[in-house]
Structure formats: structure tokens, C-alpha cells
Regions:
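Extracellular/periplasmic solute-recognition and catalytic clefts
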Residues: 134, 152-153, 220-234, 247-310, ...
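Append "and occasionally in soluble cytosolic enzymes with long acidic Gly/Pro-rich linkers
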Residues: 87, 91-94, 218, 229-237, ...
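N-terminal lobe/hinge region of extracytoplasmic solute-binding protein
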Residues: 38-98, 132, 210-214
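Bacterial N-terminal signal peptides
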Residues: 13-25
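Surface-exposed binding/hinge segments that line
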Residues: 109, 143-196
Length: 374
């Protein structure tokens, strides 16, 4: 339903969200020690900082832990660090950056139990290596702006380091994208040839190396284009995972993926990379007693981008008239069975920046006609 044109403006969304929808077999599956999950994409790389793919992020949710993350309430919290640095607690101190801008120095201390899957502690050197590789343009690690703004790292001790940014933002302490890299395994490969590192990384050549992983699970086997197999990480010091083994199986065709679920070849379909909503709703009508369905609106929104180079569309009244002329509530009811909200702005209601007081444009054909007559 998404249509696009060359423009930065957009017609207010038809519906907020590609849904996150999960399908799971009944509780009998929970008694087994292996969980098989079906998704529609296979990651092109397993390296934490090279390329961005939903399938890779899904695997990393089991196998890696970032320094910070946004929790379910969209608050920044520590995962690998002991406490979140803030200006108020003194761990973040505004400073003047080399470029003359207002910058900030942010100090983190890693948890003592944080370790790679081979038992090697995660240290400040792993952060330093990730930064060094990220600053090298030839390596192709992203996001580029993070590594540009982070102009210096001061290592205080094995677990403590200070990040120096050349600008002060409202999320100065959110370093979700600064992903630690196991320097004891990867640094020598990178130093040998930064440009070729993306094709020589152990994350793709030897992904079953335990020392690449820091989450409750580690990768033990991969079958290119078909599956990634995970097992519990013995070096993990958090709560023991529920399953001994997880198999993430790729089935790109959604009809075949549904057939795999019905045949019991997968135990669940991931909402992030699963069935389109219409197919999932049809399956729910047919098999509601066999599976548990969980539908959650996502943060993306279906919308139409408009080309403001066209004189007619450059007029705000025309764009508002288009919104008033579309019965978006009816679209949501007909296409999505009312499972998603109408998007009244580009900020999803799940986002903490959402303002419920913003004015809403209703379905108003007469109002649309008056605006066009002007």
C-alpha cells in the first residue's frame, strides 16, 4: 500500500504500522528444548556493524548485548554498563569540542560479568577497537555520523572509558549503535587490511566461534540462505534461557512459511519478518484454536510521499484537502480489521515523543471541497 514520490513531504498516513505479528504453536511446544522460528529473510552478514538488516538484528537479539538500549517504555537503560551516565549523576560532563561546539564527555563502566562466549571479558579495548574500525572509512562500518561525532575515547581502566562527542544532544548517553567488537579475535584481521575486513571477518567466515557472541545464546551453525542455529552461551551470567537450542529458519515465500507452520516444521513465525497482515488475519480466522496470535503495531507507517516540486502539491491547502477526502478509518477497518490506529502524524503513538494533543484532520469531504475551491 506504500506509494512514494521524490519529496520530503508526505500525505498523512493511512495507517500506523506494519504490524509486528507473532504466531506460535500451543503450549505443547514449550515442553521441548528446541524452538524453531520461521522468518522470511536471511542475513547477508552477521557482523554487528556492517550493513543493516532486520534478519541480522533478529539473530543479534539472542546473541549479542549492546552497551545501552531503549527499553519497552522507550527509556535509555544499561545492558553492558553498570549505570547510565547522566549530567545529573556526574558521569556526563559538557565540554567544548575541538570544533568549538558544545560537546560532552560521557563515562561508562562495564559490568564485571560481561564476557564473550569464550570467557574473555568484554573490556574498554573492545569499545576502542569498534571505534577505530568505525572511524576508518574504507572499512564501511556504520553509522558514520556516530563515529564522526565521537572524536576521542579515553580509556580509564579495563572496564571504564569516556566517550568525547563534538555535539550535545538530548540522547547523549544512548550509544546503542556503538557495538563492542571482540578485539582479541577481530583486531588483527582488521589491521591486516581495513578495506577487506568486511569479507574476512570471523562473523561470516567462522560464525560458530564462541568469542564472537555476548548474549544468552551463541551461534553454533549456519546454513547459508536457510538457517542459523543457536545454543545457550555457557559464558552468559544472566538468567538461563528457556530453550537449549533455537533454530532460526528462513523461508522467503510467505505461503510456504505458513505451510511450514501448519505442518509443524516451525514452532512460530516471527512478527518482525513473518506473514503480511492480510495473510496472518486470514490464517487467524482459520486456525485461531491451533495457534496463539499476537498483533502489535510497529513504529513504521504506511503513507504516500508527495512531490512538492509540483505547484499544486506545494500548496498546503491541497495537501490538507487530500487528507480530508480520504476515509482513513474505513481503510483501517477494511484492510486491517481495525488492528492498527490511523496515523495522524509521522510519530507513532508508541513513541515517547508522540503528542496526543496535536490537531487531527478528520474525514471531511465537504471541507476538502472548500479547500480546493479556494
Amino acid at each position: 500500500m506504500k506509494a512514494r514520490a521524490t519529496s520530503a513531504a508526505s500525505l498523512r498516513a493511512l495507517a500506523a504500522g506494519a504490524l509486528v505479528l507473532a504466531l506460535a504453536a500451543p503450549s505443547a511446544a514449550a515442553a521441548r528444548d528446541t524452538l524453531t522460528i520461521g522468518i522470511t529473510q536471511y542475513p547477508s552478514t552477521l557482523h554487528p556493524s556492517i550493513e543493516s538488516m532486520a534478519a541480522k538484528s533478529y539473530v543479534h537479539g539472542f546473541t549479542l548485548r549492546p552497551i545501552t538500549v531503549h527499553d519497552a517504555e522507550w527509556k535509555v537503560v544499561c545492558m553492558l554498563c553498570e549505570r547510565l551516565p547522566t549530567i545529573e549523576n556526574g558521569d556526563a560532563v559538557p565540554e567544548t569540542a575541538p570544533n568549538g561546539n558544545q560537546g560532552i564527555a560521557v563515562t561508562y563502566r562495564l559490568r564485571a560479568e560481561a564476557a564473550w562466549g569464550d570467557g574473555t571479558p568484554i573490556t574498554a579495548d573492545d569499545i576502542l577497537f569498534a571505534w577505530e574500525a568505525g572511524r576508518e572509512a574504507a572499512t564501511g562500518i556504520g553509522p558514520a555520523e556516530l563515529y564522526r561525532s565521537l572524536h576521542r575515547i579515553t580509556v580509564i581502566d579495563a572496564r571504564t572509558f569516556t566517550l568525547h562527542f563534538d555535539k550535545l544532544t538530548f540522547e547523549y548517553n544512548a550509544i546503542n549503535e556503538l557495538r563492542p567488537l571482540p578485539a582479541h579475535l577481530e583486531r588483527a584481521i582488521w589491521q591486516a587490511d581495513p578495506r577487506a575486513y568486511r569479507t574476512r571477518t570471523l562473523y561470516d567466515r567462522e560464525p560458530a566461534r564462541p568469542g564472537l557472541w555476548s548474549g544468552p545464546y551463541r551461534v553454533v551453525a549456519t546454513q547459508a540462505g536457510a538457517s542459523v542455529t543457536l545454543e545457550r552461551n555457557p559464558a552468559w551470567r544472566g538468567r538461563e534461557p528457556a530453550f537449549r537450542r533455537i533454530v532460526i529458519r528462513t523461508v522467503e515465500n510467505t505461503a510456504a512459511l505458513e505451510a511450514n507452520l501448519l505442518a509443524g516444521q516451525v514452532d512460530m513465525i516471527a512478527g518482525e519478518l513473518g506473514l503480511p497482515l492480510d495473510q496472518a488475519l486470514a490464517l487467524e480466522r482459520r486456525a485461531a484454536t491451533r495457534f496463539r496470535f499476537h498483533i502489535q503495531p510497529g513504529l513504521v507507517y504506511e503513507h504516500i510521499d508527495l512531490n512538492l516540486d509540483l505547484p499544486a502539491l506545494a500548496d498546503r491547502r491541497v495537501r490538507e484537502a487530500l487528507v480530508r477526502a480520504i476515509d482513513r478509518d474505513q481503510i483501517v477497518q477494511r484492510l486491517f480489521e481495525g488492528r492498527v490506529p490511523v496515523a495522524h502524524s509521522f510519530v507513532n503513538p508508541l513513541d515517547r515523543m508522540h503528542d496526543p494533543a496535536l490537531p487531527r484532520i478528520p474525514f471531511d469531504p465537504e471541507g476538502a471541497r472548500r479547500l480546493l475551491e479556494e
